[in-house]
Amino acid sequence: MRLIILFLLLSFSLVKAEVIRVFAAADLQFALRELADIYMKKYPEDKIELIFGSSGKGFAQIKAGAPYHIFFSADMKYAEELYKEGYAITKPKPYAIGRIVLWTRKDSGLDPSKFPEVLLDPRVKRIAIANWDHAPYGKASKEALEAYGVFQKVKDKLVIGENIAQTASYIRSGAADLGFIALSLAKAPELEMVGRYWLVPEDKHKRILQGYVITKEGQKFVSARRFYEFVASKEARKVFTKYGFLLPGER
């Protein structure tokens, strides 16, 4: 009898265990990992699988049938389109407002606060920027360059990253001298130790309001709804603030 009860208990726990598959914009690489760790300690029966990339790439993959349960975009547009086209079951909900910075390594000898003049420094051969066609942070960075009237002057120096995380890796590795990345990446310990940055004024680009949705695939999982709601909690909002995000409704 004891063996039967033990078997039933184990079977029940296995049924309850769920993997939440999340596609997230690359600017969330550090913040969302920390959030997921906190969540899984709180709900050990759930596991979270995180995939990071450009918002446009995640959008296209979900439309093509990728089995993601929650989609975190670096803007509202992609999340809204998924909802309108029936690929998401929840209306897009803003979770953070992103900021962009001009970042360089401490040993580069460059001062990012001397923007935009620093971009024209003869020592600067390559400037990293995310692809503005499908990466919201890349689009905001291009808008900032245009606002300062230097885009045409530096366009031949631009090195295009697939997403904002790849863009950061270009600068950190020396493949680019400096470049535009998300503040949330610049504040991560591994980048904060080796680099310095200048915060681009918000009025130089469109606001980076970021939204998330539960996908059509995710509606089958109670755990997906649980994590979705956790992201709006006070505990989660503290993590977003830690990584430099502004919070909707608190401005």
Where are these predicted regions, by residue range?
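Sec-dependent N-terminal signal peptides
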Residues: 3-13
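Exported/periplasmic ABC-transporter solute-binding proteins
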Residues: 17-43, 47-52, 56, 60-66, ...
